[in-house]
Protein backbone atom coordinates (compact mmCIF):
# COMPACT_ATOMS: atom_id res chain seq x y z
CA UNK A 1 0.00 0.00 0.00
CA UNK A 2 1.41 3.35 -1.03
CA UNK A 3 1.79 6.05 1.59
CA UNK A 4 -0.31 9.17 1.53
CA UNK A 5 1.58 12.41 1.13
CA UNK A 6 0.58 15.61 2.89
CA UNK A 7 1.26 19.32 2.71
CA UNK A 8 0.55 21.12 5.94
CA UNK A 9 0.55 24.65 7.30
CA UNK A 10 1.46 25.45 10.90
CA UNK A 11 0.72 28.60 12.82
CA UNK A 12 3.77 29.36 14.97
CA UNK A 13 3.87 31.08 18.36
CA UNK A 14 5.26 34.25 16.75
CA UNK A 15 2.20 34.37 14.44
CA UNK A 16 4.14 33.29 11.35
CA UNK A 17 3.01 30.47 9.07
CA UNK A 18 5.20 27.50 8.15
CA UNK A 19 4.46 25.15 5.24
CA UNK A 20 5.90 21.65 5.00
CA UNK A 21 5.59 18.16 3.51
CA UNK A 22 5.26 14.81 5.29
CA UNK A 23 3.81 11.31 5.08
CA UNK A 24 2.68 11.43 8.73
CA UNK A 25 1.13 14.71 9.86
CA UNK A 26 0.67 13.80 13.53
CA UNK A 27 4.30 12.71 13.93
CA UNK A 28 5.65 15.72 12.06
CA UNK A 29 3.67 18.26 14.09
CA UNK A 30 4.90 16.57 17.29
CA UNK A 31 8.48 16.87 15.99
CA UNK A 32 8.02 20.58 15.31
CA UNK A 33 6.52 21.10 18.79
CA UNK A 34 9.45 19.25 20.38
CA UNK A 35 11.95 21.50 18.58
CA UNK A 36 13.05 18.62 16.34
CA UNK A 37 11.40 19.87 13.17
CA UNK A 38 12.68 22.39 10.66
CA UNK A 39 15.13 25.04 11.82
CA UNK A 40 12.46 27.64 11.07
CA UNK A 41 10.04 26.32 13.70
CA UNK A 42 12.64 25.86 16.45
CA UNK A 43 12.13 28.67 18.93
CA UNK A 44 8.70 29.40 17.45
CA UNK A 45 6.86 26.78 19.47
CA UNK A 46 4.21 25.88 20.26
CA UNK A 47 2.89 25.34 16.76
CA UNK A 48 -0.69 24.67 15.72
CA UNK A 49 -1.75 22.68 12.66
CA UNK A 50 -4.10 24.93 10.68
CA UNK A 51 -4.27 23.34 7.21
CA UNK A 52 -3.61 19.98 5.51
CA UNK A 53 -3.96 18.65 1.98
CA UNK A 54 -3.56 14.96 1.01
CA UNK A 55 -1.96 13.71 -2.22
CA UNK A 56 -1.41 10.30 -3.79
CA UNK A 57 2.12 11.09 -4.95
CA UNK A 58 5.14 12.75 -3.43
CA UNK A 59 5.70 14.82 -6.57
CA UNK A 60 2.17 16.29 -6.45
CA UNK A 61 2.56 17.11 -2.76
CA UNK A 62 5.97 18.70 -3.27
CA UNK A 63 4.61 20.79 -6.15
CA UNK A 64 1.73 22.00 -3.96
CA UNK A 65 4.13 22.75 -1.09
CA UNK A 66 6.12 24.96 -3.45
CA UNK A 67 2.92 26.70 -4.62
CA UNK A 68 1.80 27.44 -1.05
CA UNK A 69 5.27 28.66 -0.05
CA UNK A 70 5.17 31.15 -2.95
CA UNK A 71 1.84 32.63 -1.83
CA UNK A 72 1.70 35.94 -0.01
CA UNK A 73 0.83 35.84 3.68
CA UNK A 74 -2.65 37.19 2.89
CA UNK A 75 -3.31 34.36 0.43
CA UNK A 76 -2.03 31.78 2.92
CA UNK A 77 -4.38 33.23 5.53
CA UNK A 78 -7.30 32.93 3.07
CA UNK A 79 -6.33 29.31 2.38
CA UNK A 80 -6.39 28.56 6.11
CA UNK A 81 -9.63 30.52 6.63
CA UNK A 82 -11.36 28.62 3.81
CA UNK A 83 -10.64 25.35 5.62
CA UNK A 84 -11.62 26.53 9.10
CA UNK A 85 -14.38 28.95 8.16
Curated annotation (Swiss-Prot):
It comes from the Archaea. Residues 3-78 form the GIY-YIG domain. Residues 58-70 have a biased composition (Basic and acidic residues). Residues 58-85 are annotated as: Disordered. Gene3D superfamilies: GIY-YIG endonuclease. It holds the Pfam family GIY-YIG. CDD domains: GIY-YIG_UPF0213. Belongs to the UPF0213 family. This is UPF0213 protein NP_0776A.
Amino acid sequence: MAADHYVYVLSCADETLYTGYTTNVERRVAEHDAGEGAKYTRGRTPVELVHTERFDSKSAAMQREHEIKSLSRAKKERLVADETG
